[in-house]
Regions:
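Solvent-exposed coil/turn segments that connect beta secondary-structure elements
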Residues: 1-3, 17, 26-29, 48-49, ...
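Acidic, polar ligand-binding/catalytic clefts
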Residues: 1-37, 109-111
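Hydrophobic residues within well-ordered alpha-helices
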Residues: 38, 76-77, 119, 131
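Short helix-initiation/N-cap motifs at beta->coil->alpha
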Residues: 30-31, 50, 64-78
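Periplasmic-binding protein-like
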Residues: 18-25, 51-55, 88, 92, 96-151, ...
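Short loop->beta-strand "edge-of-pocket" segments that line small-molecule binding or catalytic clefts
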Residues: 35-48, 52
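A ligand-binding cleft/hinge motif common to bilobed small-molecule-binding domains
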Residues: 1-9, 54-57, 77, 82-113
Length: 157
């Protein structure tokens, strides 16, 4: 994640992914559409993350923290949780792979805790402009969109 604090230590490429938080719910659950719908629900979070801290301070739910987010997804599928909240790329990948047909993502319209991912490189690296050129070329010829859809089953934002 590109942050001002990290920029003091390393150089970043241009952002290659715009992330935020998403909600994973069972495919049959239509009661949770946005983050405010989590009130009073049993919600899984990954322990020690910015997402967990933010959610606990902003939304009143019954939170259960897991050292590994995969265990939260398993509890969701088993019916022990109403939802799991985590970073969008992870949620989208899980929905497309192990959760396919059993779990769906929601909360896209809320744009909670937006952040941008970039490649970190040594300060003043000669690679930074080359990586940026490669990212620009991938976007220009449509390759970036194809890769994104392959892994996340959605068009990039």
């Amino acid at each position: 994640t590109i942050t001002d604090a990290r920029k003091q230590v390393v150089d970043f490429s241009e952002g290659y992914y715009n992330a935020d938080l998403l909600i994973a719910v069972k495919s049959t659950d239509n009661s949770i559409v946005k983050f405010s719908d989590l009130t009073g629900k049993k919600v899984g979070l990954k322990q020690g993350t910015a997402a967990a801290s933010f959610m606990k301070s902003k939304y009143k739910a019954n939170y259960i923290e897991f050292p590994n987010i995969d265990n939260a997804y398993l509890d969701l599928q088993a019916g022990n949780l109403d939802a799991v909240v985590h970073d969008s790329p992870n949620v989208l990948y899980y929905v497309k792979t192990a959760g396919n047909g059993k779990v769906k993502s929601t909360g896209e319209t809320d744009s909670i805790l937006p952040q941008q991912y970039g490649f970190a490189m040594q300060k003043n690296s000669s690679l930074t402009p080359k990586v940026n050129q490669a990212l620009q070329a991938l976007r220009a010829d449509g390759t970036y969109d194809k890769i994104y859809v392959k892994w996340f089953a959605k068009q990039p934002k």
